[in-house]
Regions:
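Active-site histidine-anchored catalytic micro-motif
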Residues: 1-189
């Protein structure tokens, strides 16, 4: 069976950040790594899909601007024209992930899965959540069931729709919820 082709687009955020020690959970450097670093830290990705990395931005999500959203939209819309690409994962900071997801949900012109993911702990933390979140996001973007569902947010094993998701906690790995509807699903595996 042919593996799906997934493009992982890096925009920065905690998922590619680094601290000075494994115990540092705050005050870390956002400029530490890029999306290729986190991909290489998760070799199981190659078992699920053929991966292309696209480091598009490297910013803290609190600094994202309309021009960045437009760049992301144009990039995905252009890449989505390629029939060999099955879906997209966007690594993103959690501060504005829900806003980016909502904007993309309104502006993208593709039925292909688009999944935003990130982390609450830097890549260098003892129990970094980014690698598993990335793995689960690729699993979701590779799923035929995710096609046509709009932009999705996946962290901590949960799947949320862009229209309903909210960040409700600034320190816990269980940071996102969909208060009015609940999660669309869970990733188990």
């Amino acid at each position: 069976m042919t593996k799906p082709h997934i493009v992982i687009i890096g925009t920065g955020g905690t998922i590619v950040s680094s601290g000075t020690s494994g115990a540092q959970m705050t005050g870390y450097s956002i400029q530490g790594l890029d999306v290729r670093s986190i991909i290489s830290a998760v070799p199981a990705l190659a078992e699920i899909a053929n991966i292309d990395a696209l480091p598009l931005l490297n910013i803290g999500s609190s600094n994202i601007k309309l021009s960045d959203w437009l760049k992301l939209t144009c990039t995905i819309n252009k890449l989505a024209e390629d029939p060999n690409i099955h879906g997209f994962v966007i690594t993103h900071g959690t501060d504005t992930m829900e806003e980016t997801a909502f904007f993309l949900n309104l502006t993208l012109k593709t039925e292909k899965p688009v999944v935003l993911t990130g982390s609450m702990r830097p890549a260098t933390a003892i129990s970094a959540d980014g690698p598993l979140n990335l793995l689960n996001a690729v699993r979701l973007a590779s799923s035929k069931q995710a096609r046509g569902k709009g932009v999705l947010v996946s962290l901590n094993g949960q799947i949320h729709g862009a229209r309903d998701v909210s960040k409700t906690n600034t320190v816990s790995v269980e940071t996102f919820c969909s208060p009015s509807s609940g999660p669309l699903g869970y990733i188990i595996g």
